[in-house]
Regions:
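Flexible, acidic loop-helix segments that line cofactor/substrate-binding pockets
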Residues: 24, 37-39, 43-45, 76-89, ...
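Flexible, glycine/charged-enriched surface loops at secondary-structure junctions
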Residues: 21-27, 70-79, 168
């Protein structure tokens, strides 16, 4: 959930968590309780390229705050995590391509009528889907096409499974992984029209989506851009069903703010 505070996020989570018998993706396992002090791992080798210096400085301040709160801050090696963006932008568009195939104006979406059924589909999809949606459908269709499935989609899933095992092994020695939320602060609406640069802004957050691990982004510091003060965030990632650990650490930043 998107909320104004970590406390509000926890309240919403407590409402939506748990098993729903009508939802096959839900789980009855209860979240792990808080433990107070945590061992927090920082994959520093992942923070070398593409991160604005003041964003990195802000991240170091956040680490110092957590250290002062009694948490143990250690370096952790996650060599495969650098591939998360590439893997994500193969798997995710493939899923978009598959899911959006139902958007035909008959079963889903508003119909724009043409001369025949094929034109119904092309007009509806061409007129109702945005540029980014179309781009992701095309990327996904390409990755799933004959001759490229094994080269792209299948390999992406293999790397994803390797990343999952790597992170699970890391969590045997640490409790939480800490990263900046984004390598840069927010840019102006319409300022960044390059899709690749837009995708690169997700570099630190896509791994949680790929692996299904709980994560939280907390606005903690501020940086200056063109005489404007912009927030930057701290991202915390926990093992499966350890959401309470994220809220425990995050709520202390709420108090500081």
């Amino acid at each position: 959930p998107i909320t104004n505070s970590v406390e509000d996020s926890r309240l919403v989570f407590n409402i939506i968590k748990g098993q729903d018998k009508l939802d096959g993706t839900s789980n009855e396992k209860a979240p792990v309780e808080r433990k107070g002090k945590y061992k927090i791992g920082v994959p520093r080798s992942f923070l070398v390229e593409g991160v604005d210096s003041d964003v990195l400085d802000s991240f170091e301040k956040d680490l110092e705050v957590m250290r002062e709160q009694g948490h143990d801050i250690v370096d952790v090696e996650l060599p495969l995590i650098k591939y998360s963006l590439a893997v994500y932008y193969i798997i995710m568009p493939s899923e978009v391509s598959s899911n959006m195939s139902r958007f035909d104006g008959v079963r889903f979406g508003e119909l724009i009528e043409g001369e025949d059924l094929f034109e119904d589909y092309t007009k509806t999809r061409g007129g109702k889907l945005g540029t980014e949606v179309k781009r992701r459908i095309m990327l996904g269709t390409y990755a799933l096409s004959s001759g490229y499935y094994d080269a792209y989609y299948n390999k992406a899933w293999q790397v994803r499974d390797m990343m999952k095992k790597e992170v699970e092994k890391a969590f045997e020695n640490i409790d939480i992984i800490a990263l900046p939320t984004s390598p840069t602060p927010a840019f102006k609406i319409g300022e960044n029209e390059d899709p690749l640069k837009m995708y690169l802004a997700d570099i630190f957050t896509v791994s949680a989506n790929l692996l299904g691990t709980p994560a939280i982004s907390i606005p903690t510091q501020e940086v200056e851009r063109e005489e404007k003060t912009l927030p930057v965030g701290l991202q915390l990632v926990a093992p499966h069903f350890h959401e309470e650990w994220l809220f425990d650490i995050g709520e202390k930043f709420d108090i500081i703010r």
